[in-house]
Amino acid sequence: MKIAVLLSGGVDSSVALYRIINKGYSNIKCYYLKIWVEDELSYIGNCPWQEDLNYVEAICNKFNVPYEIINFQKEYYNKVVSYTIEELKNGNTPSPDIFCNQRIKFGAFFEKINSQYDLVVTGHYAKIQIKESKFLLKQAKDKIKDQSYFLSHLSQKQMSKLYFPLGTLLKSEVRQIAKNINLPNKDRKDSQGICFLGKIKYNEFIKYHLGEKKGNIIEKETGKIIGIHNGYWFFTVGQRRGIKLSNGPWFVIEKDLEKNIIYISHNENYLKQAKRKFLVHEIHWINDTPTNFENFKIKIRHGEKKYSCKLKLITNNLMEISLNKKDQGISPGQFAIFYKNTECLGGAKIFKIIE
């Protein structure tokens, strides 16, 4: 069996490589995917991918496995970065990591290697199971690290070639394995933030592409101007950090795109803005469309929290979702991801808040 391993230089993908080798497989090649943004914004700091590459080389040398660097800068820009920029311009809250997995790691990469490999291994925290000739996406053992939210737009064809060795492990167990076998990156911190940015700060990325435009920050209840911001695209509904005003905490509760105004409110008033009903479109099911939606739960952001909900299919590409509890941070552009027990069934894009 020929196996390709996506190696990032981090602990997770390195332990995934070790576990597949430990199963007795030897016909293995590792790939490091080099992406667009890191070079384009390298003026901000040190070359962010060089450190990754140093670890990739050290890991492959340790296990005597060949590796190759594949340049996907153009594909990243066209399929992920441009989407993110457009969503920000439209005042939405994008979820680029979902498309990073669907369109690049398991899209462009699969197209590149074509049928050369029988299996592609990554360090994602999730599980794939087969039931009645269908591939099911299941949550990982570690519910905190679980990445099924970001994998929710995979296809059956993509899942048929994927294996996630870390799906049955806790993060603490992965760290312990790395120490036990003395991996060169055993003490390396986990990467944070959006997949394509590397060490680049998100606001630097936004500033580079959309610039800055001064606008008013207005207290919703009083209509008073209490501050100035550098552009609505730097803010998302529900945001608390980064407002940098006294007498807080403050929360972003509304954005006026035409006038470039950010409306904020104190905590007690912010909680009153919570919503529970919204519309989604661009619906993707990992398997066939369910015949009923009983006992479904959804996530509206990455993390452990799921909501019980009622789903009403209006058309094949339009659905109304009613949560059992209100949420303060529902925002157009986010994705609602569907679950039944531990199975991730797919997801859809939020485009209108109702109540």
UniProtKB/Swiss-Prot annotation:
Its main location: cytoplasm. One of its GO terms (cellular component) is cytoplasm. GO terms for molecular function: ATP binding; tRNA binding; tRNA-uridine 2-sulfurtransferase activity. ATP binds at residues 6-13, 33, 123. It is an enzyme of class 2 (transferase). It is found in: Cytoplasm. Keywords: ATP-binding, Cytoplasm, Disulfide bond, Nucleotide-binding, RNA-binding, Transferase, tRNA processing, tRNA-binding. The record marks 124, 334 as: Interaction with tRNA. Residues 145-147 are annotated as: Interaction with tRNA. InterPro entries: MnmA-like (IPR004506), MnmA-like_C (IPR046885), MnmA-like_central (IPR046884), MnmA-like_central_sf (IPR023382), Rossmann-like_a/b/a_fold (IPR014729), tRNA_2-thiouridylase_MnmA (IPR051305). Coiled coil: none annotated. The active site is at 100 (nucleophile), 195 (cysteine persulfide intermediate). Disulfide bonds join 100-195. GO terms for biological process: tRNA modification. It catalyses: S-sulfanyl-L-cysteinyl-[protein] + uridine(34) in tRNA + AH2 + ATP = 2-thiouridine(34) in tRNA + L-cysteinyl-[protein] + A + AMP + diphosphate + H(+). Transmembrane segments: none annotated. Its EC number is 2.8.1.13. Belongs to the MnmA/TRMU family. HAMAP family: tRNA_thiouridyl_MnmA. Catalyzes the 2-thiolation of uridine at the wobble position (U34) of tRNA, leading to the formation of s(2)U34. This is tRNA-specific 2-thiouridylase MnmA. The gene is mnmA.
